[in-house]
């Protein structure tokens, strides 16, 4: 039996691989997808999600446009990492699927009602669309089985010394999601930095001759110099692929249940995910977040390549 899953994405370079992998999992039924502004403005992320799913042979999955901007702060996209189009300039065919116009939060709520207590959400961008759904539909939170997010960092950030990009992109929306009571599985930088592919891995993927092989190689060729400049070497991180792979391969990850808040006050810690993981007494009463801390990078890389070859 397949499990119903909804993917919410800001369709950057690592999102593209995550979307493709989601179509390859035989235990997952993709019941819908949505785009949010983040790595790039909404018109580009909406286009990218549609095109990537079509490239993966799943143009039947309806993609809904979501939030164009964060709740309370200006949009601060990431062209330095993902290029102005979100995919590092990689060219892929345009999807000929009908373009949906319904708001993402309305479509997501309908999906939750159609799959009560079964729907799992994978959110790999800012959490604006999810927070909008929570606020508009009070019953929504009780209908969701789980939300697996790529976002946050217990130790340190990548957008600022304290904050990870997806959370600081809309910290007020993220705080809404963490405090909603929905069970959250958080794949922050603490674990995603353990999951990577090498330049040799990417060359191997490029040799597969699959429809998405060129996209993965070209897009990641854009972002790899950023990792080299930051001292990581010729690798890419599988940030957004982590919550997707967790759906079918939870054994790749280890975590600990914790309370998590998001710092929404201005200052050097703005956008940080603050947890009570390492204190000696309970500090945060709501412990609804499984914070992933360890990952089997070797097993992850092997399985990712296997799926992308299939």
Question: What label would you give each PLM region?
Answer:
Residues 35-38, 66-68, 265:
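Acidic/polar N-terminal loop/beta-strand segments that form early-domain functional surfaces
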Residues 63, 177, 244:
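A residue-level signal for conserved active-site and pocket-lining positions in enzyme catalytic cores
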Residues 68, 182, 249:
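Residue-level marker of positions within ordered structural domains that often coincide
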Residues 3, 46-114, 287-294, 305, ...:
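Metal-dependent C-N hydrolase catalytic cores
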Residues 14-21, 72-79, 96-99, 139-145, ...:
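Short, functional N-terminal and low-complexity linear motifs
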Residues 1-2, 21-22, 29, 168-170, ...:
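Conformational coupling and interaction surfaces
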Residues 2-9, 13-50, 85, 90-194, ...:
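Active-site histidine-anchored catalytic micro-motif
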